[in-house]
Amino acid sequence: MSGAETTALGAIAGATIFLGLPLGRVQQLSPRVRNFLAALSAGILLFIFWDVTGAAAEMIENALLGAEDGGSWGRFLVFAVMGAGGLALGALSLAWLERAMLRHRPLPPMSGGSVDAPPAAMMGVDPAAVADQARRAALALGMLIAIGIGVHNFSEGLAIGVASKSGEIALAGTLIIGFALHNATEGFGIVGPLQGTRPTWRWLILAGVIGGGPTFLGTMVGYRVSSEPLELAFLAVAAGAILFVIGELWAGAVRRAGRNLVLSGIIGGFLLGFATDLILVYAGA
Protein backbone atom coordinates (compact mmCIF):
# COMPACT_ATOMS: atom_id res chain seq x y z
CA MET A 1 0.00 0.00 0.00
CA SER A 2 1.50 3.34 -1.05
CA GLY A 3 1.98 6.28 1.26
CA ALA A 4 -0.75 8.25 -0.51
CA GLU A 5 -3.25 5.39 -0.19
CA THR A 6 -2.40 4.88 3.47
CA THR A 7 -2.77 8.58 4.21
CA ALA A 8 -6.12 8.76 2.42
CA LEU A 9 -7.49 5.81 4.37
CA GLY A 10 -6.18 7.31 7.61
CA ALA A 11 -8.06 10.50 6.78
CA ILE A 12 -11.26 8.50 6.24
CA ALA A 13 -10.80 6.74 9.59
CA GLY A 14 -10.40 10.11 11.31
CA ALA A 15 -13.33 11.71 9.48
CA THR A 16 -15.84 9.23 10.91
CA ILE A 17 -15.75 11.24 14.13
CA PHE A 18 -18.07 13.69 12.35
CA LEU A 19 -20.85 11.07 12.29
CA GLY A 20 -21.69 11.62 15.95
CA LEU A 21 -21.09 15.36 16.20
CA PRO A 22 -24.43 16.59 14.73
CA LEU A 23 -26.16 15.16 17.82
CA GLY A 24 -24.97 18.29 19.59
CA ARG A 25 -27.40 20.36 17.50
CA VAL A 26 -30.45 18.35 18.64
CA GLN A 27 -32.45 20.32 21.21
CA GLN A 28 -35.53 18.11 21.74
CA LEU A 29 -33.88 16.03 24.45
CA SER A 30 -34.94 15.92 28.09
CA PRO A 31 -32.42 16.81 30.83
CA ARG A 32 -32.38 13.14 31.88
CA VAL A 33 -31.43 12.02 28.38
CA ARG A 34 -28.73 14.67 28.14
CA ASN A 35 -27.28 13.64 31.50
CA PHE A 36 -27.28 10.02 30.34
CA LEU A 37 -25.43 11.02 27.15
CA ALA A 38 -22.83 12.83 29.25
CA ALA A 39 -22.35 9.68 31.33
CA LEU A 40 -22.22 7.60 28.14
CA SER A 41 -19.42 9.89 26.95
CA ALA A 42 -17.53 9.25 30.17
CA GLY A 43 -17.93 5.51 29.65
CA ILE A 44 -16.56 5.68 26.12
CA LEU A 45 -13.60 7.70 27.39
CA LEU A 46 -13.10 5.24 30.26
CA PHE A 47 -12.72 2.41 27.75
CA ILE A 48 -10.28 4.47 25.69
CA PHE A 49 -8.29 5.19 28.87
CA TRP A 50 -8.20 1.48 29.70
CA ASP A 51 -7.15 0.62 26.15
CA VAL A 52 -4.47 3.31 25.99
CA THR A 53 -2.94 2.58 29.40
CA GLY A 54 -2.87 -1.13 28.56
CA ALA A 55 -0.91 -0.47 25.38
CA ALA A 56 1.52 1.87 27.17
CA ALA A 57 1.98 -0.54 30.07
CA GLU A 58 2.75 -3.38 27.64
CA MET A 59 5.58 -1.33 26.10
CA ILE A 60 7.06 -0.60 29.53
CA GLU A 61 6.71 -4.24 30.63
CA ASN A 62 8.42 -5.45 27.45
CA ALA A 63 11.30 -3.06 28.14
CA LEU A 64 11.56 -4.50 31.67
CA LEU A 65 11.56 -8.09 30.38
CA GLY A 66 14.20 -7.12 27.83
CA ALA A 67 16.39 -5.68 30.59
CA GLU A 68 16.03 -8.87 32.65
CA ASP A 69 17.18 -10.89 29.63
CA GLY A 70 20.38 -8.90 29.34
CA GLY A 71 19.05 -5.86 27.53
CA SER A 72 19.36 -2.22 28.49
CA TRP A 73 18.08 -1.09 31.90
CA GLY A 74 18.43 2.44 30.65
CA ARG A 75 15.77 1.80 28.01
CA PHE A 76 13.39 0.51 30.69
CA LEU A 77 14.01 3.53 32.92
CA VAL A 78 13.45 5.91 30.01
CA PHE A 79 10.19 4.17 29.11
CA ALA A 80 9.01 4.20 32.74
CA VAL A 81 9.75 7.91 33.11
CA MET A 82 8.09 8.65 29.77
CA GLY A 83 4.98 6.75 30.86
CA ALA A 84 4.64 8.47 34.23
CA GLY A 85 5.70 11.87 32.91
CA GLY A 86 3.39 11.69 29.90
CA LEU A 87 0.44 10.78 32.11
CA ALA A 88 1.09 13.76 34.37
CA LEU A 89 1.75 16.07 31.42
CA GLY A 90 -1.51 15.13 29.72
CA ALA A 91 -3.64 15.72 32.81
CA LEU A 92 -1.92 18.91 33.96
CA SER A 93 -1.88 20.40 30.46
CA LEU A 94 -5.64 20.04 30.11
CA ALA A 95 -6.16 21.45 33.61
CA TRP A 96 -4.14 24.51 32.63
CA LEU A 97 -5.90 24.77 29.28
CA GLU A 98 -9.30 24.61 30.97
CA ARG A 99 -8.39 27.53 33.24
CA ALA A 100 -7.17 29.50 30.24
CA MET A 101 -10.33 28.81 28.23
CA LEU A 102 -12.63 29.76 31.10
CA ARG A 103 -10.76 32.88 32.20
CA HIS A 104 -13.39 35.61 32.38
CA ARG A 105 -14.30 38.92 33.93
CA PRO A 106 -16.40 39.00 37.13
CA LEU A 107 -20.12 38.63 36.47
CA PRO A 108 -21.76 42.06 36.04
CA PRO A 109 -24.03 43.14 38.92
CA MET A 110 -27.77 43.50 38.47
CA SER A 111 -29.67 46.17 40.35
CA GLY A 112 -32.97 45.45 42.03
CA GLY A 113 -34.33 41.92 42.33
CA SER A 114 -37.38 40.32 43.85
CA VAL A 115 -38.61 37.08 45.36
CA ASP A 116 -39.84 36.02 41.92
CA ALA A 117 -36.51 36.77 40.25
CA PRO A 118 -34.25 33.98 38.97
CA PRO A 119 -31.67 32.72 41.50
CA ALA A 120 -28.87 34.59 39.72
CA ALA A 121 -30.82 37.85 39.87
CA MET A 122 -31.56 37.34 43.59
CA MET A 123 -27.80 37.07 44.13
CA GLY A 124 -27.26 40.41 42.41
CA VAL A 125 -25.77 39.21 39.11
CA ASP A 126 -27.05 39.33 35.56
CA PRO A 127 -28.81 36.01 34.65
CA ALA A 128 -27.76 36.46 31.02
CA ALA A 129 -24.13 36.62 32.09
CA VAL A 130 -24.55 33.47 34.19
CA ALA A 131 -26.10 31.64 31.23
CA ASP A 132 -23.27 32.79 28.98
CA GLN A 133 -20.70 31.55 31.48
CA ALA A 134 -22.43 28.15 31.65
CA ARG A 135 -22.44 27.94 27.85
CA ARG A 136 -18.73 28.77 27.67
CA ALA A 137 -17.97 26.13 30.31
CA ALA A 138 -19.92 23.45 28.40
CA LEU A 139 -18.25 24.27 25.09
CA ALA A 140 -14.83 24.39 26.76
CA LEU A 141 -15.35 20.92 28.24
CA GLY A 142 -16.44 19.57 24.85
CA MET A 143 -13.32 21.01 23.22
CA LEU A 144 -11.10 19.56 25.96
CA ILE A 145 -12.60 16.14 25.22
CA ALA A 146 -11.83 16.66 21.52
CA ILE A 147 -8.21 17.51 22.38
CA GLY A 148 -7.79 14.42 24.56
CA ILE A 149 -9.32 12.21 21.88
CA GLY A 150 -7.13 13.86 19.25
CA VAL A 151 -3.93 12.97 21.11
CA HIS A 152 -5.19 9.39 21.42
CA ASN A 153 -6.09 9.25 17.72
CA PHE A 154 -2.60 10.38 16.75
CA SER A 155 -1.23 7.21 18.33
CA GLU A 156 -3.87 5.19 16.42
CA GLY A 157 -2.71 6.83 13.20
CA LEU A 158 0.87 5.86 14.03
CA ALA A 159 -0.21 2.21 14.28
CA ILE A 160 -1.93 2.38 10.87
CA GLY A 161 1.11 3.97 9.21
CA VAL A 162 3.62 1.55 10.74
CA ALA A 163 1.54 -1.52 9.74
CA SER A 164 1.16 -0.28 6.17
CA LYS A 165 4.83 0.61 5.77
CA SER A 166 5.94 -2.82 7.04
CA GLY A 167 3.81 -4.51 4.36
CA GLU A 168 1.12 -5.83 6.72
CA ILE A 169 -1.73 -4.72 4.44
CA ALA A 170 -4.40 -6.88 6.07
CA LEU A 171 -3.49 -5.54 9.52
CA ALA A 172 -3.46 -1.96 8.27
CA GLY A 173 -6.90 -2.39 6.69
CA THR A 174 -8.27 -3.94 9.86
CA LEU A 175 -6.88 -1.11 11.97
CA ILE A 176 -8.45 1.47 9.66
CA ILE A 177 -11.89 -0.17 9.93
CA GLY A 178 -11.64 -0.63 13.68
CA PHE A 179 -10.40 2.88 14.38
CA ALA A 180 -13.10 4.30 12.11
CA LEU A 181 -15.71 2.59 14.30
CA HIS A 182 -14.01 3.94 17.42
CA ASN A 183 -13.96 7.46 16.02
CA ALA A 184 -17.66 7.32 15.18
CA THR A 185 -18.47 6.69 18.86
CA GLU A 186 -15.99 9.37 19.95
CA GLY A 187 -18.08 12.00 18.16
CA PHE A 188 -20.88 11.25 20.64
CA GLY A 189 -18.33 11.54 23.43
CA ILE A 190 -17.51 15.12 22.47
CA VAL A 191 -21.06 16.50 22.28
CA GLY A 192 -22.66 14.36 25.00
CA PRO A 193 -21.67 16.68 27.90
CA LEU A 194 -22.91 19.92 26.25
CA GLN A 195 -26.10 19.78 28.36
CA GLY A 196 -28.53 21.72 26.18
CA THR A 197 -25.89 24.08 24.83
CA ARG A 198 -26.35 24.14 21.07
CA PRO A 199 -22.96 24.48 19.38
CA THR A 200 -22.51 26.24 16.07
CA TRP A 201 -21.58 24.25 12.98
CA ARG A 202 -18.24 26.03 13.06
CA TRP A 203 -17.60 24.72 16.59
CA LEU A 204 -18.57 21.19 15.57
CA ILE A 205 -16.26 21.28 12.55
CA LEU A 206 -13.37 22.57 14.69
CA ALA A 207 -13.99 19.88 17.32
CA GLY A 208 -14.08 17.23 14.59
CA VAL A 209 -10.82 18.41 13.07
CA ILE A 210 -9.11 18.51 16.48
CA GLY A 211 -10.45 15.08 17.47
CA GLY A 212 -10.23 13.23 14.16
CA GLY A 213 -7.52 15.09 12.25
CA PRO A 214 -4.64 13.60 14.28
CA THR A 215 -5.52 10.14 12.92
CA PHE A 216 -4.60 11.48 9.49
CA LEU A 217 -1.43 13.16 10.79
CA GLY A 218 -0.40 10.09 12.77
CA THR A 219 -0.82 7.90 9.70
CA MET A 220 1.55 10.12 7.72
CA VAL A 221 4.14 10.14 10.52
CA GLY A 222 3.84 6.39 11.19
CA TYR A 223 4.35 5.55 7.52
CA ARG A 224 7.60 7.52 7.46
CA VAL A 225 8.93 7.10 11.00
CA SER A 226 8.69 3.95 13.11
CA SER A 227 9.42 4.94 16.71
CA GLU A 228 8.26 3.02 19.77
CA PRO A 229 9.27 5.83 22.18
CA LEU A 230 7.22 8.31 20.13
CA GLU A 231 4.18 6.03 20.28
CA LEU A 232 4.62 5.54 24.04
CA ALA A 233 4.86 9.29 24.59
CA PHE A 234 1.59 9.97 22.80
CA LEU A 235 -0.17 7.07 24.51
CA ALA A 236 0.88 8.36 27.94
CA VAL A 237 -0.11 11.96 27.22
CA ALA A 238 -3.45 10.77 25.82
CA ALA A 239 -4.08 8.68 28.94
CA GLY A 240 -3.46 11.67 31.21
CA ALA A 241 -5.65 13.98 29.14
CA ILE A 242 -8.50 11.47 29.01
CA LEU A 243 -8.23 10.80 32.76
CA PHE A 244 -8.66 14.53 33.47
CA VAL A 245 -11.73 14.74 31.23
CA ILE A 246 -13.31 11.66 32.85
CA GLY A 247 -12.96 13.33 36.24
CA GLU A 248 -14.66 16.48 34.95
CA LEU A 249 -17.52 14.52 33.38
CA TRP A 250 -18.05 12.39 36.48
CA ALA A 251 -18.21 15.37 38.85
CA GLY A 252 -20.66 17.30 36.68
CA ALA A 253 -22.91 14.36 35.80
CA VAL A 254 -23.26 13.10 39.39
CA ARG A 255 -24.12 16.60 40.59
CA ARG A 256 -26.88 16.97 37.99
CA ALA A 257 -28.30 13.46 37.67
CA GLY A 258 -27.31 11.27 40.61
CA ARG A 259 -25.15 8.17 40.83
CA ASN A 260 -27.49 5.51 39.44
CA LEU A 261 -28.13 7.20 36.09
CA VAL A 262 -24.47 8.15 35.75
CA LEU A 263 -23.21 4.65 36.50
CA SER A 264 -25.68 3.20 33.98
CA GLY A 265 -24.40 5.58 31.31
CA ILE A 266 -20.75 4.90 32.11
CA ILE A 267 -21.26 1.14 31.94
CA GLY A 268 -23.14 1.51 28.65
CA GLY A 269 -20.42 3.71 27.16
CA PHE A 270 -17.66 1.35 28.29
CA LEU A 271 -19.45 -1.64 26.77
CA LEU A 272 -20.04 0.30 23.53
CA GLY A 273 -16.33 1.03 23.27
CA PHE A 274 -15.49 -2.57 24.14
CA ALA A 275 -17.89 -3.85 21.46
CA THR A 276 -16.15 -1.85 18.74
CA ASP A 277 -12.83 -3.21 19.97
CA LEU A 278 -14.14 -6.78 19.76
CA ILE A 279 -15.18 -6.12 16.16
CA LEU A 280 -11.62 -4.98 15.47
CA VAL A 281 -10.18 -8.13 17.07
CA TYR A 282 -12.61 -10.41 15.23
CA ALA A 283 -11.89 -8.79 11.87
CA GLY A 284 -8.18 -9.26 12.41
CA ALA A 285 -8.48 -12.87 13.53
Where are these regions (language model features)?
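Intrinsically disordered, metal-sensing/regulatory segments
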Residues: M1-A285
